[in-house]
Amino acid sequence: MSELLFETYGVPSIGNDTYLFVPLLSIVHGSFEVRIVDAKDVSSYFLKGEPVLGACCRTNVGGFHITDFLRQLLSLKYPYHSASITWEKAEELKKEHCYVALDYMSELQIFKNNKEEAEEKTRYWQLPWVPPPVEEPPSEEELARKAALKEKAGQRLRDMAAAKRSQKIAELEKQLSYLEELMEQLDGAEEEEATAILGRSGYLSQQEIKSAILKATQSLRKAKGESNGNEEKADASGVDKYPLVSVPDETLTPEQLKEKKKQILLKTTTEGRMRAKQRRAEEEALREKQEEERRLENPELYLEELRARYSELSDRVDQRKRQKLNGGKTNGNHNSSGGVGRGERLNAAQKERMRLLTSAAFDRGKGEDTFGTRDEDWLVYKKMSKDNDDDDDGNDDDESELARIASKIQDMDPTFVNKAEAVQQTPEPPKVRTLTAEDYRISIGIERFRCPEILFQPGMIGIDQAGIDEMVSISLRRLMEDEAVKERLCQSILVTGGCSLIPGMIPRLESGIRQFRPYLSPLKLVRAADPLIDAWRGAAAFAASSKFGRHTFSLADYREHGENLFHRYNIVYSL
């Protein structure tokens, strides 16, 4: 400190020892001859009358730590408002709202159990908050204007749709007129002339033209909004869809023969699919009937069978999914030793796929093309698929069966949860709540007395020291064994410093000191007249006295003796 004052600030002289014992200056101003408990903003000192340095104690906890502890607690409690909880604001809150509890644990129990009393002791700090703008309901004029704009836009769309419909009707009428005129020409023409007319028109036969006329007529009626009574009958007619199937081959040209083969293939495929669909529907109806009979006969057994079937199918589907994710490594004969040929790494399904691809690539137009006459012919595309596996044939069937069984179980057991639905269920998006003034209100309850408590329990902030009440007893033990002197000192304890202004400080300090004093021993604590500036006024009075010159250390003395002249007291700062 002396080096800082002389070297940096260039002061001419400083008090010999008084700047080390600032609380002593309160006595100079107040004319006391007492023990001093300085609860100032930085540290706390304990002195007895004239300085008895062997009995001095010092704590590292003061008003600064209370303010910083309060700021940290509020910042952790309200992290979104940490920018508003500045050190200066925490200092202001400490001076206005903090107090020292006479019994710390009892005060905590009040906030734990007694809600009404705790609410009375709680203080609130309202941060600046601007309410969101309230949307005013539109006026009648605004509603009328929007309705007019909406009606205008709707009318414009209706006009556009009507114009488009009129254009389509005109095109259909023109097409229908052309087709009817073409049919009139074919009715009165000979065979060679009819063939030439068909070649120019792009149609293959009169049946195809009739089918086109029927479709155009239906489209025209639909565009005009008229009913189509014979639409279903026309759609059901195989002659209209496949006009060349019933025509003899002798009367067809080579191009028409190719088209006839395509129509036969499509017709056969469609009929096969319809038969398979009807067969599956009949089997499904029969199975549903049998299951319903079993359910009515023994519902518990039926439900148990459904659960077992569901578990089996679920495991099978999960296993297939894991195999696909692992690249199908669980299928086929895989050799992990390396150095084998391509054929040795293929399983049976992959070899069959390669054979089909090779056959399709080199078998071009050999013999009569009868592909598609049987339903089984179309399974070749599934076998040729790259994703095909030896277990993939029933994959879709298993998943559909699994969904069906899960639906039946849910009908009988509402508490059942389908695994697929549980996995596919997407989490709900977080709901955004509008912030209110309550969200910008900071509550200060336990913090009011918890922060000043660190003066008596420094361990709360990690400082391994005794509290100021215990330090008084330690200071007394360091004095002489004369009990009369101790009793006289305990009757005039001066409490000074900024922290002594905290409400409840004097009663709590007195209660703590009594615990270390004999029963019914006299004890009196006095707060300084002005704890904040009494020390400064005492220093000013001492500096103005004639004795001040004998207690100063000048710059010349500093340069001659150095700062070691100050190191002559053995004060124990820690306990």
From Swiss-Prot:
Source species of the chain: Oryza sativa subsp. japonica (Rice)
GO biological-process terms attached to the record: regulation of DNA-templated transcription
Major location (coarse): nucleus
Region of interest called Disordered, as start-end residue ranges on this chain: 267-298, 313-343
GO CC term, one of those recorded: Ino80 complex
Protein name as annotated: Actin-related protein 5
Sequence ranges of Basic and acidic residues compositional bias: 270-298
Key words of the record: Coiled coil, Nucleus
Entry coiled-coil feature ranges: 100-196, 273-325
UniProt family annotation: Belongs to the actin family. ARP5 subfamily.
InterPro entries assigned to the protein according to its UniProt record, in alphabetical order: Actin, ATPase_NBD
Subcellular location: Nucleus
